[in-house]
A protein has these predicted regions:
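Beta-strand/loop nucleic-acid-binding surfaces
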Residues: 27-41
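Flexible glycine-rich surface loops and low-complexity tracts that mediate binding to linear polymers
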Residues: 44-56, 205-206
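Domain-level recognition of nuclease-like catalytic cores that cleave nucleotide substrates
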Residues: 170-221
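Conserved catalytic cores of phosphodiester-cleaving nucleases, focusing on short active-site segments
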Residues: 9, 110-140, 153
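Short nucleic-acid-contacting surface segments enriched for D/E, G, S/T with interspersed K/R
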Residues: 37-50, 154
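Short aromatic-glycine-enriched beta-strand elements
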Residues: 16-21
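Acidic-basic catalytic patches of nuclease active cores, encompassing PD-(D/E)XK
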Residues: 40, 72-101
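Nucleic-acid nuclease catalytic cores
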Residues: 134-144, 154-183, 205
Length: 221
């Protein structure tokens, strides 16, 4: 996945979930943050950030904040739309007969439905931007929706689908993701239930480029 044009900046502050103030070449710009999560461990005053430049003259903000440099870790892509985009590209190379995004199942919309021959597959995508002590954690904010998705995947697996949840690790040097039970206590048991039902847990390791995000390795959880 590539961004059209990238500019560099220095993060100043974040008045609310949707916007931030960033120093771009000495000018304070109001930018859109492409992640409504807290990201408090990432968006620290003085942190280097990368901004996607918009070509839409009707927008209120010229830039989207898509990546931030974390000390001792490197660049973290924090664009919440990026995981589904890179997984869509990745799936297109996996020899499925059919790949369909946003598939309705039960009371949820699962990110991807695939077919290969007579077999049907479901894949739910989760982006990971939270790192503590060299380990990735999900979620970084409360998500009842994420818990519901795991229950739906377990049910679908029992019904004959082949199901997986894929954690897209949006930073380099991290190879596994663990449940952040401190933020969402139910997520850990729901993930364990899904695994017990046969749902695969995938860790998708990424290369974070200046203007790109690319899946480079798949590991089993």
């Amino acid at each position: 996945m590539k961004y059209r044009e990238i500019a560099d900046g220095i993060f100043l502050d974040r008045p609310n979930r949707f916007i931030a103030h960033v120093d771009v070449n000495g000018t304070v710009e109001t930018v859109h943050v492409k992640n409504t999560g807290r990201c408090r461990e990432l968006l620290l005053p003085g942190a280097a950030v990368r901004l996607e430049v918009s070509d839409n003259p009707k927008r209120k903000t010229k830039y989207d904040l898509v990546a931030v440099r974390k000390q001792e870790l490197g660049w973290v892509n924090m664009d919440s739309q990026a995981p589904n985009k890179v997984v869509g590209e990745w799936l297109s190379k996996q020899n499925f007969d059919l790949v369909r995004p946003e598939f309705a199942y039960g009371r949820s919309r699962i990110d991807f439905y695939m077919e290969k021959g007579e077999q049907k597959y479901l894949l739910e995508v989760k982006g990971c931007t939270l790192e503590v002590g060299g380990i990735g954690y999900f979620p970084d904010a409360p998500t009842e929706r994420g818990v519901k998705h795991l229950h739906e995947l377990a049910q679908a697996q029992r019904a004959g689908y082949r199901c997986a949840v894929a954690f897209v690790i949006q930073m380099e040097g991290i190879t596994e993701v663990r449940p952040n039970v401190g933020t969402q206590p139910e997520f850990g048991p729901a993930l364990a239930e899904a695994k017990a039902a046969g749902v695969r847990v995938l860790f998708l390791l990424c290369h974070v480029g200046r203007d790109s995000l690319e899946i480079v390795e798949q590991r089993e959880g």
